[in-house]
Amino acid sequence: MGEHPERVLRRVVPDPVQVQVILGSLLGDGRLEGGEGERRLHIAHHQGRAEYVWWKYERLGIFAAHTPVLRGETLEFHTIAHPVFDDLAPLFSGPDRKRVRELLAPLGLAVWMTDVGRLRLRAEVFLPTQRAAALVAR
């Protein structure tokens, strides 16, 4: 009998776009849940930002535990537990927090600013090569 699919997915390495969506989300409204070995990412935004939640889901879909669901006025989803979240957890607490800036690329910054309401991600503002990498679902 084969391995459970979730265990197999824990060995999949996030691509650069996924890493930036994760970093930007964690700097914004996203949060890590669970302890070491079981950490997962929780994404939640007001239902009025449903298009944005689905955009994040499309980029992180392989790691999503379920499709976005509406709870009250919040549309949310969780990822599966993944080792990348254990690796990132120290960067989002304590003295290592400043190291996040070294990892952040323009897409991660855009996600962060969109999360906090300072920016709206729009495909037409990206250069064609950036659009292909950042905005087109894979």
What kind of feature is each model-predicted range?
Residues 1-138:
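Internal intein/HINT superfamily modules and their associated LAGLIDADG
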